[in-house]
Amino acid sequence: MAAKRKAAAMNAVDDEPVDPSDELAFYCLGGGNEVGRSCHIIQYKGKTVMLDAGMHPAKEGFSALPFFDEFDLSTVDILLISHFHVDHSSALPYVLSKTNFKGRVFMTHATKAIYKWLIQDNVRVNNTASSSDQRTTLYTEHDHLSTLPLIETIDFNTTHTINSIRITPYPAGHVLGAAMFLISIAGLNILFTGDYSREEDRHLIPATVPRGVKIDVLITESTFGISSNPPRLEREAALMKSITGVLNRGGRVLMPVFALGRAQELLLILEEYWETHPELQKIPIYYIGNTARRCMVVYQTYIGAMNDNIKRLFRQRMAEAEASGDKSVSAGPWDFKYVRSLRSLERFDDVGGCVMLASPGMLQTGTSRELLERWAPNERNGVVMTGYSVEGTMAKQLLNEPDQIHAVMSRAATGMGRTRMNGNDEEQKIMIPRRCTVDEISFAAHVDGVENRNFIEEVSAPVVILVHGEKHQMMRLKSKLLSLNAEKTVKVKVYTPANCEEVRIPFRKDKIAKVVGKLAQTTLPTDNEDGDGPLMAGVLVQNGFDLSLMAPDDLREYAGLATTTITCKQHITLSSASMDLIKWALEGTFGAIEEIGTDEDAEKEDQQSESEEKQRMKEEADEEIPMEKPQAYLVMGCVVIRYHPRTREVELQWEGNMMNDGIADAVMAVLLTVESSPASVKQSAKHNKHHHHHHHDETDTLKFLNPHAAQDAEERFARLLMMLEAQFGSDIAPIERPRVPSSTESATTTTNGNGNSKSDSEQLSSLESKTDGATPQDPDTLSELEAAELSRLHALGIPVPGIEIKVDKHVARVWLEDLEVECANAVLRDRVRVVIERAVETVASMWSVGRSSKTITNGGGKEIAGTGADDVASKPGLEVAARA
């Protein structure tokens, strides 16, 4: 597996440049610093996930929608709906039918079943009653029903992978079907809680922290900030006290609730209380709404998704029904004895005391608002608020106990408000006096401040993003969480983005490859063992963000990939190079070459047919020439070279891949230059020089075949000049006049008046200002001596006596007969000497070394006498060694 970065490296990430692909982007299109129209976008590694699509219950028309125009919805891969409440799901039909959204939508089975009826009823209510004089229809009932098939359902605790995004829903405990989603993108784990509850109630499974998963980012609600609720038993007692107080004075109790969710929990509480208090059983409990009746069937269907209390009631009532023998007896836990269902207020006989659970919970429109306007003027009546009240709604205003409330349903029923006057709209409002009592006892299925903080601490995510909360509540919770950082080694980062605000958080996740197949059987070194262990090589396969390392043979089984091996062949015909020369050239480039002998199978592959093989062997037998089997060598462990001596054909064979192709190209480059490169010519010349036992006709044949074997001195001299120009520039000229020996000595030593010899540096003290090599002697005598010397040099194969090299202000002379270098500058002299030696070795033997006696100076300017090349080469410390 890939090595993980050490802690020090991880901590230094913040100081390093961050790749945009390593940043998690979070956009709040709704639900930022507010409660309502929840909609969030997360982007990471090119993947986009949309969380919820709700509408604001306190707003109407387009203003109730999230800010969809601020984001390109066509880039969204998947949309996850946490639960069916309107502030989390009612904008979904608009997204699917009115926008360019192209992704997939997921929710749980129970959520979709209730969502169908809830949104359908919501569309009908909004189309029949509104506080606006000009209503805006965002989508129709047909839009809603036509988009239902686009919604896919998933079960709790099951993992699904969509476009390399892994999602797992967990019970959230908020309402039936409500889910927390664990989202994994490229190893980054994000937990979105939605609305969740950790409280033990009568029918739902409370939310728990996913086990065995390290959460990197937690996106959680902050509805109640840091405020805490009283214990559950105290709230139930307060609820019953408030309800019975109103009933005892002959009033009616209005409990505004969402049609589904907390309403079912309150019905269970009331049913249980009425069961134990016979004096109340004569007072009816009403649950009004056509949608509520239909959705109760869903609750009866998904008993298996509820907690043990509901399952116990189900088994108990099933046993009672079986014991009675009456099959008509209802046996479900949702078949109430004291709760009656009403389709509408038209069938409601408003006489005497009662308890009425009506929707919607925010009292904006609908049945609950109509009953509020009807019962508010009577001081014997009472309103009990049990859910969370969103800012800007009538439910929130009613908690302040105003003296008057605005009549909406009465105005719509009487037709008032449809004729607008030129005056202020405030003057046209119908106000109703409020004399009823108002109590608030929270049974909202949201975590309070203590439960939320404990959940965040248990998850231990390094990054927390707070949503779904009013700004002041959210900031109080943020301050509390940041205050806990003083006790932590790893500080928690808390973000509270507002609507349309972008948050970018850098994350660098280690890329971990899973080793599978044959490679998984390799024993890896333990921590106690020294060394890095064996080198593991294989094929790295990426499927989405998952990496797997496997042997090529396992690709079909573990990756589902079909493998194809491409064998490449290349044929090159050489005119004269032998296998020895080829091997020598390849070894100089690639190191040791492995000889693998002959390959009969390869020979068979080269033969096109059996008839051609027989014909070839017959011809070879007629010629009575013994067949030489091809020689095979392996270069770099991947390229096979076969040399056929008779045809001088070289065959290359290798398995095609990026690395092998590069090696094969390099081998072909060596083969294509093996007959023309100066180094190869020199090597072949060395081999041919000392084998005098070869037949002359064979040697002549090889010279004829090799175009470099018959090169003359002029060609070699031109190559020498080319190499020198590459090193010292173009200011290089041949020396036309040779060095002439003095008449008094056979050597070239110059003596001063005292009989001491002068060194070359003393003789060349004025060389940089002179351009010819003659001494002031008689021109006629000098011309004859020069002519004789030139003739002698030409006879030796030396085209010119020497070469003059000018570099800036310095001049160096090279005499080609003995390769002596003369220069007043020691650095340039040494440099020229080294280049000359390398050049002569490259272009092979230049010419014979003169046999006349010479004086060659060493580094100290002392004279060393010699009689030939052998003597010169044998002297230690020479500046120039003659090359034979």
From Swiss-Prot:
Pfam families: Beta-Casp, CPSF73-100_C, Lactamase_B, RMMBL. Keywords: Endonuclease, Hydrolase, Metal-binding, mRNA processing, Nuclease, Nucleus, Zinc. This is Endoribonuclease ysh1. Residues 762-780 have a biased composition (Polar residues). Residues 605-619 have a biased composition (Basic and acidic residues). It comes from the Eukaryota. SMART domains: Beta-Casp (SM01027), CPSF73-100_C (SM01098), Lactamase_B (SM00849).
